[in-house]
Amino acid sequence: MIKRVLAVSLMGLSLAGCVNNDSLSGDVYTASEAKQVQNVTYGTIVNVRPVQIQGGDDSNVIGAIGGAVLGGFLGNTIGGGTGRSLATAAGAVAGGVAGQGVQSAMNKTQGVELEIRKDDGNTIMVVQKQGNTRFSAGQRVVLASNGSQVTVSPR
């Protein structure tokens, strides 16, 4: 039984390690973004504010399922007969809630909110992951946009 619990735990940790928030940074492009034409504009940073980017609730499903399975296994080791069934169900519910919480915490990443006055006079706000590049007010930046997403980089 211990081997099963250990195997399920390792599988859950392996899946959790697959979370990748690097594409939220202005320093990283996905494979589908490479070699794509992007419109470029220029601007100046007006204000910089650190923010926290929370992954979507849909991504917490893996944590909830993994936690429920692990909790069910652990609950199944308690008691016998009806007590075992109740412990299995309670363990699955508690494990699911705990697993979702752990996955939610893992999906948080440090970001930066950039208020940018574009050279055309418009002011925009962009939130992206805080990568290796540090931004500051007054800094000139280049904005690369594919129509639905924009990436801010130093000029």
Curated annotation (Swiss-Prot):
Gene for this chain: slyB
Signal peptide: 1-17
KW Cytoplasm (keyword) present: no
Origin superkingdom: Bacteria
Keywords annotated in UniProt: Cell outer membrane, Lipoprotein, Membrane, Palmitate, Signal
PANTHER family: OUTER MEMBRANE LIPOPROTEIN SLYB, PTHR35603
GO (cellular component) term, any one: cell outer membrane
Lipidation (S-diacylglycerol cysteine): 18
Topology with respect to the bilayer: Lipid-anchor
Family: Belongs to the Pcp/SlyB lipoprotein family.
Keyword Magnesium listed: no
Compartment annotation: Cell outer membrane
Lipidation (N-palmitoyl cysteine): 18
InterPro entries: Bact_OM_lipoprot/Surf_antigen, Gly_zipper_2TM_dom
Protein name: Outer membrane lipoprotein SlyB
